[in-house]
Amino acid sequence: QLIKFRDHTDPILYPDINWIDYCMNKAAFQSQHNVNISGGTDRMRYFVSAGMFTQDGMFKQLAASDNFNFNYKRYNYRANLDFDATKTTLISVNIGGRIETKRTPESGEDQNQLFRKLYWAVPFAGAGIVDGKRVVSNADYLPFTGSDGLNSYYGKGFRSTTTNVLNVDLVLDQKLDFITKGLSFKLKGSYNTSYWTQKIASSSMAVYTPVLHDDGSIGYRKSGSDSQLSYSRNSNGEGKSRDWYMEAALNYSRKF
């Protein structure tokens, strides 16, 4: 048996897998794009910005039908408008926000535990994915099998969290030189809101255990079954917050 582990001559019954290398890619794709537009007239200035950021996960898809991998997408936007209502009155409107979607494997635990179990996985606990089937070691042939690197996440679905954040500022800046030169009044109001919702997509995947036949061929004993994704939300699957802010100031700036 030790020779088969060493020489990898029987990778089904006596596997030897580095689960980090088997489950994860060396790198993941990341992209960022931004567009800015600015302009205006004598009485109005504007600035508009939009951006997109994407980050793929490092897990290999292997034979899974659903995309369980880590994934992050963010779309951000901003628009600033300064308008001279009169020669002494400036009105500014600033709108900004972002929409982000984060997907994580549905392991039933926090993500730190997922990676710990991947590092703790036993090299001979399974043969990985063979002909589209997840194969785990047979305890009849090995005194100890433990858990393979796929046990904590593979074929269990994913969680998708969407967050929407909006920030709005309205500013009025009024010169009061008709009272005294250098005097001005500023009024600012802000509204901030955030809303998030989480969707859970659960599934299951059958596990196969290799069995050695008398003629030397290998068959598989099936445990469990494959199921399609089913979507749900838990009681803590959404949340929102909002706040208002108001500020008023009287400023005086003058050189004598």
Located regions from the model:
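Conserved small-residue
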Residues: 1-9, 107-108
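Flexible loop and strand-edge segments within Gram-negative outer membrane beta-barrel domains
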Residues: 11-51, 55-58, 68-147, 159-163, ...
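Small-side-chain secondary-structure face that scaffolds active or pore-lining regions
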Residues: 53-74, 104-109, 163-167, 178-256
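Membrane-embedded beta-strand positions of outer-membrane beta-barrel proteins
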Residues: 48, 93, 170, 185-189
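Short glycine/proline-rich turn/loop motifs
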Residues: 13-16, 147-153, 226-232
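Individual transmembrane alpha-helix segments
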Residues: 154-158
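Intrinsic-disorder/low-complexity loop/linker signature
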Residues: 9, 132-133, 216, 226
